[in-house]
């Protein structure tokens, strides 16, 4: 129940091809609680949820939207690699379906109420776009929100000059944390409208704000989000969404209320039992009645999806020999189909080539600059320490060995070595002192007296000393 002063939002989670579940929920809300959609402050969506939110806000035919999802899934299943086949262009298909389904004034209806979750490529931050200037801009916002990198292509699309990718990467369920937000998700968990699995596992997996209970059914749903299941499975998911929407409305007292802004009176126990019985009847034998309440276009699409065409070509293609021959010819037909689809995409890409090439050059330069800066940072952290260790080790090995047992150890080093605080200066002065000591060892100072080199005259024979012995020959000394 919603009082007069209460405001509420509706948020649809991204889920790939399981978006047909959102179509069932939206059909239930539009049929049984139109006030809930009309009076909602904002209706948010991410990825496939953005497509349903756009259809719900702009008043587009939900039956046609559901039929488009089923047709796209059938086209993807026809190919050998499914959505990954080169000839399957999901972005082009989504754009064509939106152009055909949305009304001409869709951007006027959506501005201010619709919120599309996007992921900005430059920094990975989440952005919610709520204002649109034209129908093409609204369609481009949906294309950006559903663009899964590598799965849909390598070059992300542009909106208002900025590159965006799938909004589910950064925020798959916008504004889920607000208590007044009605959250819708095809995965069983803690969302307001979601499947109620009977698993007793209490563990949950939270992926970008989306609560997913850890059980086998959710694992199966996750596996079919990007690779579409059979049309019968999609039909059951749409019915499941319709049932879960009815359960939410009944549990909150919003089913078929003429004035929901007024508080509802308390419900007596007998009425609660009657409501529980109605829920049980709805679950057991009400599937046919549910199909009657679905939009006519969606009901027709669901019925057609369960019936195989009976023409001759379909019958021949389903025969076992033809299927075996087709599988054996895949190595030859796949390169040819890839070449044709590549040529077509290249021709369609020509108008955007200059802008995309410029963007790729900028991204390549940014990546290279980031790698260079990171390498410089790592080298700057390791090289100085390694070099200083090697220099200190080399200088330490060149020092003279001084025995530690020397009693006069303090006298072995000069005062400038003991008092210096810098090891490098001490080593430099020690080497200088060592060179001076070596020069002192190999240099000898010879001192001559002043008269050492003076010539002396010989002594006369008459002035001989009597104590000096005379030569017996009587000859004078030489």
UniProtKB/Swiss-Prot annotation:
Residues 30-42, 159-323 are extracellular. GO terms for molecular function: acylglycerol O-acyltransferase activity; diolein transacylation activity; mono-olein transacylation activity; phospholipase A2 activity; retinyl-palmitate esterase activity; triacylglycerol lipase activity. Residues 10-179 form the PNPLA domain. It catalyses: a triacylglycerol + H2O = a diacylglycerol + a fatty acid + H(+); a triacylglycerol + H2O = a 1,2-diacylglycerol + a fatty acid + H(+); a triacylglycerol + H2O = a 1,3-diacylglycerol + a fatty acid + H(+); a triacyl-sn-glycerol + H2O = a 1,3-diacyl-sn-glycerol + a fatty acid + H(+). A motif (GXSXG) lies at residues 45-49. Residues 456-478 are annotated as: Disordered. GO terms for cellular component: cytoplasm; cytosol; lipid droplet; membrane; plasma membrane. Induction: Increased by rosiglitazone in subcutaneous and visceral white adipose tissue. The chain crosses the membrane at residues 9-29, 43-63, 138-158, 324-344. This is Patatin-like phospholipase domain-containing protein 2. The gene is Pnpla2.
